[in-house]
Amino acid sequence: MSKTVVRKNESLDDALRRFKRSVTKAGTLQESRKREFYEKLSVKRKRKSEAARKRKKF
């Protein structure tokens, strides 16, 4: 869980920007999107294989 404390004399926009940066750096949104729905093992393997194929292609 990302936590951001608003500093003294800091605008809310700046604090929100720091929070968003910390969330993306931690990968929280990606992880929650990935776990939103159950993914069958066969589908997961297929997706992983496709990603490896794309990486190898370039």
UniProtKB/Swiss-Prot annotation:
Domain of life: Bacteria
GO biological process terms on file: translation
Pfam families given in the database record: Ribosomal_S21
UniProt-listed PROSITE patterns: RIBOSOMAL_S21
A GO term, aspect molecular function: structural constituent of ribosome
Gene3D superfamilies found in the cross-reference section: Ribosomal protein S8
Keywords of the record: Ribonucleoprotein, Ribosomal protein
Database matches in InterPro entries: Ribosomal_bS21, Ribosomal_bS21_CS, Ribosomal_bS21_sf
GO CC terms of this entry: ribonucleoprotein complex; ribosome
Key word Ribonucleoprotein present: yes
Family: Belongs to the bacterial ribosomal protein bS21 family.
NCBIfam families: S21p
Entry protein name: Small ribosomal subunit protein bS21
Species assigned in the record: Streptococcus pyogenes serotype M49 (strain NZ131)
Gene responsible for this protein: rpsU
